[in-house]
Amino acid sequence: GGGFIGIEIAENLIEMGLDTILIELNNQILAPVDFEIAKIAQDEMIKKGVNLILSDGVQKFSENQIILNSNNAIDYDLCILAIGVKPETDLARKAGLETNRGIIVDEYLKTSNEFIYAAGDNIEAKDFVSGQNTLLPLAGPANRQGRIVADNICGFNSTYKNTQGTSVVKIFDLTVASSGNNEKQLKQKEIPYWKTYVYGRSHAGYYPNSDMILYKLLFSNDGKILGIQGVGESGVEKRVDVIATIMRNNGTVQDMIDAELCYAPPYSSAKDPVNILGMSADNILKGLVKPAYFEDLKDAVVIDVRPNMIYKMGTIDGAINIPITEIRSRLDEIPRDKKVILSCNTGYTSYCASRILAQKGFNNVYSFMGGYELYKVLVKESAKLNHA
């Protein structure tokens, strides 16, 4: 299983010096996040020695062999099942309580029997983003639910205000954190959304030991925050916690811009990644930039606006090079009748170039969100990754 428990166990087995294989039925580990975030975590696990098998599951066990759905056989000495949890609702059903996948409760965590409350991993709580019933086995919500039940038994009329699914996991030297819905969930629920990617620093880049963090923000047309994901070495969960708190208070991307957070070079930048994410989203909503994503590249003219020396070190397949410093003098090389996507290293320079071209009358220009750094994540083949 490639969830939190499976990953944590795999890390500890590697630290003990054991040969470790992790098998996951889906095409990625970590279901709460989208593929591009999970891909960075997968590469970290492979780098540390975990043999990852994705898009495959266990068909059967023998005494010392596992047979996979692909009919491949794996010898083993120890097998650990970390394949998730399922609510135990037998007692609730026998008591005549209304159940679905879990026990049905109202906002007071009261079941269909007014004298019985339920809390924890066996209840269906409402999703904070969609309002739909969901199962989210997380310790934080379960503990708060216990207090709410105690309050209501004592007559304080406390309500549970839905589950965001805020979570974090350590994967060797990386941290992955998220809150709200991911892109897959928004598509399944048919919730309209925008997305942006920002590479931010754990603290000021000119201060030693600054790490790069990739963030993915999902938001609605009116600026409501629908989901946040991040992966990096340090400072990830701090920013996700801040954005989760803004979400909890029904804040918007504008509130992310306005957030006044701690700043000193060892801890952050004058414009924290939370602020930058809000600004990037706000630019999209105001029409200051047209965002483009990996799936848009194949149908467009791609222009890399980085210096030629950097362009030659690696670029998006098929991209031509017009450095931003030359773009005003080379307008005649840029088509006006085709979709043009500008790319740089992480998305900032391509945004600036898109603004220059917009002021020159180009209305067919897009900025590739996340830039070449994100592109490398998505196209790079993981060494030792096995698929069914």
Q: Each PLM stretch: what is its role?
A:
Residues 18-21, 51, 115, 339, ...:
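Residues at the starts of beta-strands that form the adenosine-phosphate
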